[in-house]
Amino acid sequence: MKHIFYIDGERNNFGDDLNRWLWSRVLGFSLDVDDGTVVLGIGTLISRGFVPSANKYVVLSAGVGYDALPLDFGGQKWEILSVRGPLTAQFLNLPPEKAIIDGAALVRLLPECEPLPESQRDGVAFMPHYESLPAGNWEQVCGMAGVEFLDPQVPSEITLQRIRKARLVVAAMHAAIVADALRVPWIPVVLSPLSNSFKWLDWTMSLNLPYNPITLQASTLLESVRNFSLRF
C-alpha cells in the first residue's frame, strides 16, 4: 500500500482533486496508506519544489513543467511506470513507451462516466484555471454569456458529471482532459501569461491532437492588471 501524493493547497483544484479518489476506484484498492512509498499521479508533480521525502517514489502518469527535478531523481528510489506525455519522457530521457497519457483520462473506466449520446448533452460549460479565480469574475461573465460556470474548487466528482452532460467544454487543461475522455468536444483557453503550454502540449501530443488555444481577455480590471504585471 502506498501514499498518493498531490497538491492539496488552500484552494481546491479540479485536476489535483481527482487524485483524492480516482486511483482507488481504478485500481480497486486504496493508495492512501503511508508506508514510506509515494505515488506521483495526476499533475505536474515531478518537481523539486513539490516532492516530499520518501523511501521510494512511483511515477504513475505525472509530468514535469515547473521546477528542477528532485535531487535524487532516477536513482534507486525511483520507479517510473508511466509519464504524462512525450515531452516529459524526452525531458527525463525515458523510452517513448513510458509516455502514456495524463491519468485524468482514466475517468473513462468508471461506469458512471460512460459517454452520453449527444441528444442527452446540452449547453456550453466553462472552467477557468483555479489561479484565475481571486482576481477574476468568470462566473459573472459566464452568466452574461449564457454559459455554465464550472468552479474548479468544487469537488471533482460533481464537476465531472457536469462536464459529461455538456455539449461543449471551454476550459483549463484537466477539464479538457476529462472532456476528451468522455467524448465531449472541448476548446483550450489561455487566461494568463502563466499558462503552461508545455503541459498542454505534453498531453495533446500523447494523443496526436493539435493544440490551438484561444486567449481570452481579462474578466475584471484587477485581473487585467495582474496579467499585465506577470509579463514583466
Regions found by a protein language model. Give the residues of each.
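Active-site anion-handling motifs in enzyme catalytic cores
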Residues: 1-232
